[in-house]
Amino acid sequence: MSSQPNKNLKVFDNPNIERNFIIQINMPEFTCLCPKTGQPDFATLYLEYIADKVCIELKSLKMYIWSYRSKGEFHEAVTNKILDDLIQISNPRFMRLKAIFNVRGGIYTTIIAEYQQKNWTFKTKIDLQYQG
């Protein structure tokens, strides 16, 4: 597997497909570029998901996240694009991506995007707030 930034997300078989378990991934080094100024925007990404048939392979996720370092993207667009790509590759039962961007011009931005499979519900109430 390449150690260069790329968009090639990989998955592996869910080892406990019969169970709803939460996978939480903290990515504190996300960087993209402001599409207006070209200046870097820094964020911490919090991914929470309940896998269905496959789980996301972590090294490929790291390389995928690094691929945004030279891309000009608005916070809202990049958060939703990442979520869409992760959903497309893994088709999770549930997925939430929270992007907390560092201060820019005195303003902090947090974007939260979610997805849930149609006809899938968790049998008990669950709080998926990242505890990291």
UniProtKB/Swiss-Prot annotation:
Keyword Cytoplasm among record annotations: yes
PANTHER family (UniProt xref): NADPH-DEPENDENT 7-CYANO-7-DEAZAGUANINE REDUCTASE (PTHR34354:SF1)
Signal peptide positions on this chain: none
Species per Swiss-Prot/TrEMBL record: Vesicomyosocius okutanii subsp. Calyptogena okutanii (strain HA)
SUPFAM superfamilies, alphabetized: Tetrahydrobiopterin biosynthesis enzymes-like
Annotated transmembrane regions: none
E.C. numbers: 1.7.1.13
Pfam families attached to this UniProt entry: QueF
Keywords for this protein: Cytoplasm, NADP, Oxidoreductase, Queuosine biosynthesis
Similarity comment text for this entry: Belongs to the GTP cyclohydrolase I family. QueF type 1 subfamily.
Function (record text): Catalyzes the NADPH-dependent reduction of 7-cyano-7-deazaguanine (preQ0) to 7-aminomethyl-7-deazaguanine (preQ1).
Lineage: Bacteria, Pseudomonadati, Pseudomonadota, Gammaproteobacteria, Candidatus Pseudothioglobaceae
Swiss-Prot/TrEMBL catalytic activity: 7-aminomethyl-7-carbaguanine + 2 NADP(+) = 7-cyano-7-deazaguanine + 2 NADPH + 3 H(+)
Binding site for substrate: 56-58, 75-76
NCBIfam families: QueF-II
Listed GO MF terms: preQ1 synthase activity
Gene that encodes the chain: queF
Pathway connected to this protein: tRNA modification; tRNA-queuosine biosynthesis
One term under GO cellular component: cytoplasm
Active site per database record: 34, 41
GO biological process entries: queuosine biosynthetic process; tRNA modification
EC class: oxidoreductase
Subcellular location per the Swiss-Prot or TrEMBL entry: Cytoplasm
Name this polypeptide is given: NADPH-dependent 7-cyano-7-deazaguanine reductase
